[in-house]
Amino acid sequence: MIHTDIAEILCVKPKTTKKTKTMEEDVKKTTTMKIEGEVVVMKKNLLDFKDVMASLLDRVNELLGRRVSLHLISSHQPDPANEKRGRLGKAAHLEKWVTKIKTSVTAEETAFGVTFDWDESMGPPAAFVIKNHHHSQFYLKSLTLRGFPDGEGGATAIHFICNSWIYPNHRYRSDRVFFSNKAYLPSETPELIKELREEELKNLRGNEKGGEFKEWDRVYDYAYYNDLGAPDKGPDSVRPVLGGSPELPYPRRGKTGRKSTKSDPKSESRLALLNLNIYVPRDERFSHVKFSDFLAYALKSVTQVLVPEIASVCDKTINEFDSFEDVFHLYDGSIKLANGHTISKLRDVIPWEMFRELVRNDGERFLKYPLPDILKESRSAWRTDEEFAREMLAGLNPVVISRLQEFPPKSCLDSAKYGNQHSSIRTEHIESNMNGLNVQEALEQNKLYILDHHDALMPYLTRINSTNTKTYATRTLLLLQADGTLKPLAIELSLPHAQGESYGSVSKVFTPAEKGVEGSVWQLAKAYAAVNDSGYHQLISHWLQTHAVIEPFIIASNRQLSVVHPIHKLLHPHFRDTMNINALARHVLINSDGVLERTVFPSRYAMEMSSSIYKNWVFTEQALPKDLLKRGVAVEDPNSDNGVKLLIEDYPFAVDGLEIWSAIKTWVTEYCTFYYNNDKTVQTDTEIQSWWTELRTKGHGDKRHESWWPSMQTRDDLIETCTIIIWIASALHAAVNFGQYPYAGFLPNRPTVSRRFMPEPGTDEYAELEEDADVAFLKTITPQLQTLLGISIIEILSMHSTDEIYLGQRDSPNWTADDEPLEAFKRFGKELELIENNIIRRNNDKRFKNRTGPVNIPYTLLYPNTTDYTREGGITGKGIPNSVSI
């Protein structure tokens, strides 16, 4: 530490060098001006309710002269000690810290005045250094310089958007530097901040930093999914490492640096279950508001603690719903926990006062869940064939259904390994229910569709069924009718051959029936199909294809794209909170014996199965138009805005999604065109090229040799890539996440587990089905304890945070200094508002039956909510957040 730094900390005036005549002449030539600034911060103690002492120590430091200092950095004059860097201005300090910062449990921002002595000849500052000499960290939101000369006789403001935690200075090996909101391509960066730009990226890469990362470390690096298992607990807790091998490929996650387990050096050790302080770079962690909202998530996750108490819910049988009335009681407060002892114990370990109120111990305790949308109109509409089919187009997993292009359906599994896996559905099963069409006519008229989970599940089915799960690989055939709705024609349930997988599958085909035992069998067949779809939704459509695949982009962007890079500014809002939510998911959701394994049918094989699906993941096919073409639900149409025409006109996800996709692409095109004049500017952008190389070779390293990756040699490559990233992080995630509680909060509609096979005639189970179909149904699907745990989790996962930032919104109006991108962003917002109106209009149009269905749930999962600034949050069933934030 140099002597001036020590002097600053101790508030001692350093010994000055005797002025020479030349120095005095230089001083006369300079014109010093006062620059008034405003710094917005949030103190740590406002977030950490038990850390009042930190606030007191900060005040003591302030009184002793250990203050928060800022130095502006010139973009015009070089530093005499390092000509590659801009000259530092005089230190300025935050004013009135002691009187402005209050010890409070409310997370309030505080604005401090700061006055800089600035030499006019140094020009406008391009960056600043901040040093925190206090005891504890604080959140630095922004610095704004007011009244800075604009060179034309007027004055302007210079904005520095920071949004970063500043730890005490001794925690860092280099200065904390922040740049103004002006965007620069690498080649256009002012010479005197180029080195700072490059050094900041090196800091974020960590330079192969070893050991476990600490909360103040700002390191972004890659790791395999090797922290899902707990091999030190025994063989039942071992899980394979995902990523780094051809057999089990996977996107990379953020590195934590935790040590290996004792039993397996390839596996990373885990934190205690209730310890949520998993390392992610501090600025990637939830905001104070989001964390407060999300603590409820942790509360629900420890429902496992209450399992012995919850078992007393039933009056007849343990862990079973005796009737649908029992299930309905979950939503009216009739489920009682008579023993408050466990509740009281749980309450005592929650250190946050506001959340103790969630588990009050004031007498009798009741579990009560909000009524899911699926039940609000009718308690039985969910059981109709129309609703069953409609949810494939407008439910919580509308991204799997495809057009049947050959009959019978064919399998793509290796016949040498799995035998004959082709479908056993034949024309005689379905033609009598096809409204006068035969199969060939229906194929030619694009009327046959399929929900096909057969190939995804069959390789794992023997192992899955060796657990408590008893399920099938399913295919569901549907007919597109004249009114635009889909009608189920048949459901095929398949099992591996008893003699082994190589002997093929053994299948049974079930067709619609309404009455008698045949009707009950059909309801069970739909339940098995729903179990498949629920598991695929949670593991693949939701976790893998949004959460997991986007994390490598976040890591690569922070390692290779400077905060002043225009593409960093474009993408950064779409990465908010994702690393934090993914880390928490690894900790309590997708880990061995975690919530997912407890509540979804693949159980311990769930994540391994998602790795198998990742083998076929193609980045370019995540573009919505290409996805629709791949699934055959659209055809190419050069006359349409997106180049495709839907074959199902009333396909709410696709109709709304294409409008959102088009709006995003227009916005990205206008933005990128402003900074990139031609293809060469993309080719010569060193940061973009490094970013793209690292993303392919490290972030998605198991797919580094795939030929489908864009070459990133044209502006169109960049535009399409950024559009796909934003689409995945915002709209695609919203479509598959926020409908969870509205549709699956009533688990019989979206069961996640099946516990026994289809009853065979002549068995006790078949007799039970004949006698009481509802009891047989409930004994087949997710049992009571898993239901309580499952809906507790999806209730939280379906909630918008009260600090949600929706597509078309930014957390600061000054996110860039460039006027044209700001205007383009306003146009983007206006377009999203038009889409909101279009969605409302379509939902009210009675011609579009799939937009509401028998359950009367308007399709709003892709309603942008750009116009909503209320910050109310909760389960709304609408709104596209900028990022995968829950």
From Swiss-Prot:
A Gene Ontology biological process noted in the UniProt record is: fatty acid biosynthetic process
Q: What residue stretch is flagged as signal peptide?
A: none
Tell me which UniProt keywords the record has, alphabetically.
Dioxygenase, Fatty acid biosynthesis, Fatty acid metabolism, Iron, Lipid biosynthesis, Lipid metabolism, Metal-binding, Oxidoreductase, Oxylipin biosynthesis, Plant defense, Stress response
Residues annotated for Fe cation binding in this entry: H542, H547, H733, N737, I886
UniProt catalytic activity: (9Z,12Z)-octadecadienoate + O2 = (9S)-hydroperoxy-(10E,12Z)-octadecadienoate; (9Z,12Z,15Z)-octadecatrienoate + O2 = (9S)-hydroperoxy-(10E,12Z,15Z)-octadecatrienoate
Q: Which cofactor does it need?
A: Fe cation
* Cofactor: binding details: Binds 1 Fe cation per subunit.
Region ranges (Disordered): 234-266
The record's Pfam families line, in alphabetical order, gives: Lipoxygenase (PF00305), PLAT (PF01477)
- List, in alphabetical order, the Gene Ontology terms for molecular function in this entry: linoleate 9S-lipoxygenase activity; metal ion binding
Q: What induces it?
A: Induced by the green peach aphid (Myzus persicae). Induced by infection with the fungal pathogen Fusarium graminearum.
- Pinpoint the PLAT domain residues: 35-180
The answer to whether UniProt assigns keyword Secreted to this entry is: no
Phenotypic effect of disruption? Increment in the number of lateral roots, and moderate increase in the length of the primary root. Reduced performance of green peach aphid (Myzus persicae) on foliage. Enhanced disease resistance to the fungal pathogen Fusarium graminearum. The double mutant plants lox1 and lox5 exhibit enhanced susceptibility to the bacterial pathogen Pseudomonas syringae pv tomato DC3000 and the biotrophic powdery mildew pathogen Golovinomyces cichoracearum.
Lipoxygenase domain residues? 183-886
Q: Does the keyword Iron apply?
A: yes
Pathway as given in its UniProt record = Lipid metabolism; oxylipin biosynthesis
CDD domains named in the record: PLAT_LH2
Tissue expression, as annotated, is:
Expressed in roots.
InterPro entries per the UniProt record, alphabetical:
LipOase, LipOase_C, LipOase_C_sf, LipOase_CS, LipOase_Fe_BS, LipOase_plant, Lipoxy_PLAT/LH2, Lipoxygenase_dom_3
Q: What family is reported?
A: Belongs to the lipoxygenase family.
What's this chain's function?
A: 9S-lipoxygenase that can use linoleic acid or linolenic acid as substrates. Plant lipoxygenases may be involved in a number of diverse aspects of plant physiology including growth and development, pest resistance, and senescence or responses to wounding. Catalyzes the hydroperoxidation of lipids containing a cis,cis-1,4-pentadiene structure. Function as regulators of root development by controlling the emergence of lateral roots.
Q: What is this protein identified as?
A: Linoleate 9S-lipoxygenase 5
Which gene is the coding source of this polypeptide chain? LOX5
